[in-house]
């Protein structure tokens, strides 16, 4: 049960292999995808190498895997849900998904995971509500010999078995860099309202730091930074409050829920031509918004792939096979120029996908 690079082969040819990777995700029996590998693991500042991730063909037995999400309130987590559920089916393992109902429900997430473990889970995949708040629980679960995989959001625990996630600092940076290039230093100052997400979540703190770093030294002025849960009502209220306090903002940039809520609000107020919208991650709503010209751009972190990899990591560890300890899909910006050629299978759940809480 040791981490290894043997399951990966070096990727060359960037965009070509990205397209090939997406195509192979559709295959019924197997898939592969361009990823980045951090080594030493669990440090986002570690050097990265580009690889092509190939999962197991099948599990040796129907392992019972528990998956815990912060919530299932938006299409971002639906995509991760599709990734973990479909990969569990492909590998032939059991999967039980629990969701805590929102980023304010840390204690509920902890108790749900504890119940999963008490119910016989052999591995746990966690999309964490808090960067540090689950560390004691992770330590307790690991002490029982149960692997814990950190997916999407990030945790600071050193006891983790593996990570399947990207740098949200880089996601925030890419969004900030995109707009900063349009308004370089020396040009007319432009006000931006920034909505990074729920306070205290690891991905939010990283995303905020990356965004602020990217716009520093440009003509971008961050007029307001508003934190809040990624429920639509919460984000809509934050946008309304910000527009009242700063009617001269030219960009609304933030979570996918922020961007989707802003589209309707700006249209209703006749402000669509005056204020541009960006998200710093990717959902079906953002995808549609970019296609229709209502959202300017967003980086994609290939959410479905992160879910698939997490399940594959769990099975590899349970079976004592070589596994990759810290891996995440390569990031790409999607805008009006390439949205038409973008294959959604790596980032979005299929049309008509319903939340899947159990795979037997």
Predicted regions and their residues:
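An alpha-beta-alpha
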Residues: 65, 69, 84, 173-220, ...
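Hydrophobic alpha-helical segments within soluble ligand-binding/sensing domains
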Residues: 48, 52, 109, 164-190, ...
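Flexible loop/hinge segments that line or gate small-molecule binding clefts
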Residues: 29, 131-170, 181, 191, ...
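Extracytoplasmic "Venus flytrap"
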Residues: 36-54, 64-83, 87, 91, ...
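Hinge/cleft segment of the Venus flytrap/periplasmic-binding protein
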Residues: 28-63, 195, 199, 215, ...
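Exported/periplasmic ABC-transporter solute-binding proteins
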Residues: 248-251, 263-330, 334-343
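Gram-negative bacterial Sec-dependent N-terminal signal peptides
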Residues: 2-25
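Hydrophobic alpha-helical
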Residues: 123-143, 211, 228-289
């Amino acid at each position: 049960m040791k981490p290894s690079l043997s399951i990966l082969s070096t990727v060359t040819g960037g965009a070509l292999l990205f397209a090939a990777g997406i195509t192979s995700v559709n295959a019924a029996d197997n898939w592969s995808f361009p990823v980045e590998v951090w080594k030493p693991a669990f440090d986002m500042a570690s050097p990265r190498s580009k690889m092509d991730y190939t999962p197991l063909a099948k599990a040796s037995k129907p392992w019972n895997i528990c998956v815990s999400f912060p919530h299932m309130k938006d299409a971002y987590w639906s995509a991760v849900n599709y990734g973990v559920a479909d990969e569990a089916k492909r590998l032939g393992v059991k999967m039980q998904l629990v969701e805590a109902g929102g980023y304010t429900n840390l204690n509920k997430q902890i108790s749900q995971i504890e119940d999963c473990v008490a119910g016989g889970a052999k591995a746990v995949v966690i999309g964490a509500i808090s960067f540090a708040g689950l560390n004691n629980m992770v330590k307790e679960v690991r002490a029982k010999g149960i692997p814990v995989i950190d997916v999407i959001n990030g945790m600071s625990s050193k006891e983790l078995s593996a990570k399947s996630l990207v740098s949200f600092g880089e996601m925030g940076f890419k969004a900030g860099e995109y707009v900063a290039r349009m308004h370089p230093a020396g040009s007319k100052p432009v006000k931006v309202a920034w909505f990074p997400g729920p306070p205290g979540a690891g991905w939010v703190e990283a995303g905020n730091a990356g965004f602020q770093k990217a716009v520093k030294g440009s003509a971008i002025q961050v007029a307001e930074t508003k934190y809040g849960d990624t429920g639509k009502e919460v984000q809509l209220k934050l946008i309304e409050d910000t527009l009242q306090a700063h009617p001269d903002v030219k960009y609304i940039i933030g979570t996918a829920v922020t961007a989707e809520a802003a589209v309707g609000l700006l249209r209703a107020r006749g402000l669509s031509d005056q204020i541009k919208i960006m998200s710093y991650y990717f959902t079906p709503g953002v995808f549609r918004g970019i296609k229709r010209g209502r959202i300017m751009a967003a980086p994609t972190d290939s959410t479905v792939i992160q879910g698939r990899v997490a399940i594959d990591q769990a099975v590899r560890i349970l079976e004592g096979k070589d596994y990759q300890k810290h891996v995440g899909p390569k990031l790409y910006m999607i805008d009006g120029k390439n949205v038409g050629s973008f294959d959604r299978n790596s980032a979005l759940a299929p049309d008509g996908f319903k939340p899947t809480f159990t795979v037997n």
